[in-house]
Regions:
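Membrane-embedded alpha-helical bundles that constitute the cytochrome b-like, heme-associated redox core
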Residues: 1-216
């Protein structure tokens, strides 16, 4: 396969922006036309949540495709996809907070206590926002190695979001399960990277024990 040039990558990035924005703008027609179902608030919440999940899976798909096709420049698509994922997830949260619960903080607190899937979703959103904010090149340079450690949490988000979706549905668990399987399939090639920190901990503990002076 011919190596992608800068113009090709820029074109793909433009498609990411146009597609992500276009599907949001479509809501300006879909909501008044009643295309989101009998409960438009619930329909809007699900639409934005599933859109964020799709963007998350696409973000995780970039690296395997770049490696498989030997197209390193494709990596440049991860940042716009990740930022749009965070944007869609934020809108999903704001619709739930503002339109569904109408900023009733007492009701919000009760929902957090009763519904664990909301807590899971909020943890995932906070991680996405942290990743989005620190994707600024200046912060990347200032954070150094800590930047990569933080951004490895995208893999945790990839599991939290399908679980949030699965726990939130009252019926029809098959679709969330498919998303969870897809997320696991995308994480499987990265298993060595994901398990490396856990394998280091016993080694560090043994090394520390070996360095302790023996008592007389």
């Amino acid at each position: 396969m011919p190596r992608l040039k800068t113009a090709h990558v820029n074109g793909l990035r433009a498609l990411v922006h146009l597609g992500s924005l276009g599907f949001l703008l479509w809501l300006g027609y879909a909501v008044p036309a009643g295309l989101l179902g009998g409960d438009p608030v619930q329909g809007l919440t699900h639409y934005l949540g599933k859109g964020a999940l799709h963007l998350l899976l696409l973000t995780l798909l970039v690296s395997p495709l770049a490696k498989r096709w030997r197209q390193g420049p494709l990596i440049k698509l991860r940042r716009p996809l990740g930022l749009w994922c965070a944007a869609w997830a934020s809108l999903h949260f704001m619709v739930w907070l503002g339109l569904d619960l109408q900023f009733d903080w007492g009701l919000i607190g009760g929902e957090l206590v009763k519904r664990s899937y909301i807590v899971v979703g909020m943890v995932a959103l906070l991680l996405l926002l942290a990743l989005g904010i620190t994707s600024i090149p200046a912060l990347l340079r200032r954070m150094g190695p800590a930047w990569q450690k933080l951004h490895n949490w995208i893999y945790g988000v990839a599991l939290l979001v399908p679980i949030h979706y699965w726990w939130s549905v009252k019926s029809g668990w098959q679709e969330p399960l498919i998303y969870l399987v897809l997320a696991c399939a995308l994480l499987w090639p990265r298993r060595e990277k994901l398990l490396r920190p856990w394998r280091k901990r016993p080694q560090v503990a043994r090394r520390g024990a070996a360095q302790q002076p023996s008592r007389p």
